Amino acid sequence: MKIKLRLNKSTIESVKADLIEKHIEISEDANLILTEENYAGDSMECRNETGVVFVNTESICYMESIGHDVYVNTNDKRYKTRYRIYQLERLLPSERFIRISNSVIIKKNSIRHIKPALSCKFYLTLTNGSVVDVTRTYYYKFKEFYGI
């Protein structure tokens, strides 16, 4: 059995030792991922036209789901990831990322402008120039976080 680890630096060595002792192989190309609850990873596995790349989470502006595909958008590039939006919501640290609709997660400090709209919505202009909307489902959570 192969497992990919997504653990904080404080616990990774002890978990690795336990898994190796139990004859479990640790590999980056494994289908199973063991993720710590408060894992604050610094990079995310994505794909572009040349292959697999690791995108630094600090450079991410927002992530969006379009159909069955999930895209990671930085200020200047767009990557595809195999993670689903609900997985990214759990994987990424909630101190830096917030879900604003069923299909979009933004980095909290990537907002350039907030424009209120009718019927419990906001339109956000992000640092890369994209405009995304906070839907009614996530409206109050967004307002509470930013103190609006």
Descriptions of predicted regions:
Residues 32-127, 131-133:
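Conserved binding/recognition cores within well-folded domains
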Residues 5-8, 132-135:
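Active-site-adjacent beta-strand anchor residues
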Residues 137, 141-148:
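Charged phosphate-binding loop/patch that engages nucleotide di/tri-phosphates or the phosphate backbone
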